A protein has these predicted regions:
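Conserved interdomain linker/interface between the two RecA-like ATPase lobes of SF2 helicase motors
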Residues: 175-252
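Conserved helicase ATPase core of P-loop NTP-dependent helicases/translocases
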Residues: 70, 85-100, 116, 252, ...
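Walker A/P-loop
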Residues: 24-45, 252-256, 278
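Post-DEXD/H (motif II) to motif III coupling segment of the RecA-like Helicase ATP-binding lobe
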Residues: 134-196
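Conserved helix/coil segment N-terminal to the catalytic DExD/H
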Residues: 93-127, 138-143
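Conserved helix-turn-beta segment of the N-terminal RecA-like "Helicase ATP-binding" lobe
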Residues: 55, 66-93
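Conserved pre-motif I regulatory segment
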Residues: 1-31
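Conserved strand-helix element at the start of the C-terminal RecA-like helicase core
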Residues: 58-69, 224-271
């Protein structure tokens, strides 16, 4: 357990605690705030797991979005466990039913691909890592527990909670928590921030409170959210908030639906804030170019 892999002190501490918990439990969830390097910790853990095991051991890493799959593949490659993914438009890797690339003994899947193609998967992994593990309550993830009950599992998340207030003890045996956000900020690992919210008795909050339907994961249903919240009055208020609190700064807006995202981008652009919408239907190459453009230019 002496490997450091360039980890920060708190990442090294979390890795040590994880391997200690694996001595007692088969399935462990790890919580770390957004921005503290969960993916780097994940890669370091996988590398140490493989180095400590026998020849032929295999690891599956499962994520819920294509972008996360590519991000994890890139990080895993930097840790010497495979090559970086080809993101070109010609690459069949981004196709709906294309086989994820073999990266040595580590393979990274989207849960959608894995659920569609599980019958063609040969053998079994020795470790399954679930990125954004708060999604693990979905039946597609639960199937992994049913099919591979004896396989060691690791869940990584910033938010180990469900909107239906139920825990994860049916999937994970124990939870390892990191420092608080305040402590990360105090030690200089996270930036400080200002938090602005709508009032508890506002019209907007009443609209949110009026949402009644829930999905299988306890979250709001997209169709109802779009019907209730995708309105010009709400979008105008979002725009006014940007002007008031974030004028001239870059930002990301998380919309409730694809249609909502496109309406927001159109409204912002019409009123002088250059904006684009990116969603699950955006082609991979175009998505990559838009993200790079956002990083490198003044696009807000």
């Amino acid at each position: 357990m002496a490997r450091n892999d360039g980890l920060r002190d708190y990442q090294q501490e979390m890795k040590l605690r994880l391997f200690e918990e694996w001595e007692l439990h088969r399935s462990v969830m790890v919580q770390m705030p957004t921005g503290t390097g969960k993916t780097h910790l994940l890669a370091a853990v996988v590398k140490e797991f493989l180095c400590g095991g026998g020849v032929g051991m295999r690891v599956w890493i499962v994520a819920h979005r294509r972008e996360l799959v590519e991000q994890i593949e890139e990080t895993v490659a930097r840790y010497g466990m495979g090559k970086e993914p080809d993101k070109s438009a010609k690459n069949g890797r981004t196709g709906k039913d294309s086989m994820p690339e073999e990266s040595g003994r580590v393979r990274v899947f989207s849960i959608q691909w894995l659920s569609r193609n599980r019958k063609i998967m040969d053998g079994r992994p020795d470790l399954i890592v679930i990125d954004e593990a708060h999604h693990a309550l979905a039946e597609t993830y639960r199937e992994l527990w049913k099919r591979y009950p004896e396989v060691r599992k690791l869940g990584m998340t910033a938010t180990p909670c469900r909107l239906n207030r139920k825990g994860f003890t049916d999937l994970f045996d124990t939870l390892i928590t990191s420092w608080s956000i305040a402590e990360f900020i105090g030690r200089g690992w996270l930036s400080s921030f200002d938090y602005v919210s709508i009032r508890a008795n506002s019209r907007e909050q009443r609209l949110v409170d009026s949402l009644k339907k829930r999905g299988a994961d306890g979250d709001y249903q997209v169709k109802e959210m779009n019907a209730v919240l995708n309105r010009e009055t709400g979008i105008r208020q979002l725009y006014e908030s940007v002007r008031r609190y974030a004028a001239g700064k870059k930002g990301i807006v998380y919309a409730v639906s694809i249609a909502h995202a496109r309406q927001i981008a159109a409204y912002y652009s019409l009123h002088g804030v250059e904006a684009v919408a990116i969603d699950s239907r955006t082609p991979a190459l175009e998505r990559k170019e838009l993200v790079e453009d956002f990083i490198e230019t003044t696009k807000q």
